[in-house]
């Protein structure tokens, strides 16, 4: 018998075809729906918020009163955040910036209660040869990649 794992998640572009502020309005709306669902629907056990912590800062700038709600869900491992600060595009940056991105993101996630232990890279248009070395340095035992392989 094979196991099928369904992982509810979102990929979040901080800016893309709209402004940062336009996307932040959507972020706040989706974050509110996600929080309400995790807190009130016993059949919805966890959610992965794109492995980046900058979205927590963006949301908490508008709704700082919800920090404890987020911390509770992250600490219970029902809301997975980090280890990145922002999703990197490996074609545009150096190994040093990748390491610092992970350092900042994992520290923020740890402060919230838990940093996801997967090097989640769903939207990079290329990959760096140093990914295994960098992931090992942050004790990330697995990596999820999508395009650019």
What name fits each language-model region?
Residues 1-149:
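Carbohydrate-active enzymes and regulators
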């Amino acid at each position: 018998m094979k196991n099928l794992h369904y992982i509810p998640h979102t990929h979040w572009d901080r800016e893309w075809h709209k402004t940062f502020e336009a996307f932040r309005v959507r972020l706040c709306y989706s974050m509110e729906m996600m929080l309400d669902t995790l807190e009130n629907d016993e059949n919805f056990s966890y959610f992965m918020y794109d492995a980046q912590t900058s979205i927590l800062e963006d949301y908490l700038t508008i709704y700082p009163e919800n920090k404890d709600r987020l911390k509770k869900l992250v600490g219970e491992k029902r809301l997975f955040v980090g280890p990145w600060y922002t999703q990197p595009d490996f074609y545009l940056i150096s190994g040093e910036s990748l390491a610092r991105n992970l350092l900042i993101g994992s520290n923020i996630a740890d402060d919230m209660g838990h940093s996801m232990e997967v090097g989640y890279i769903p939207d990079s248009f290329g990959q760096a040869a140093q990914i295994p070395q960098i992931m090992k340095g942050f004790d990330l035992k697995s990596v999820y990649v999508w395009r650019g392989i």
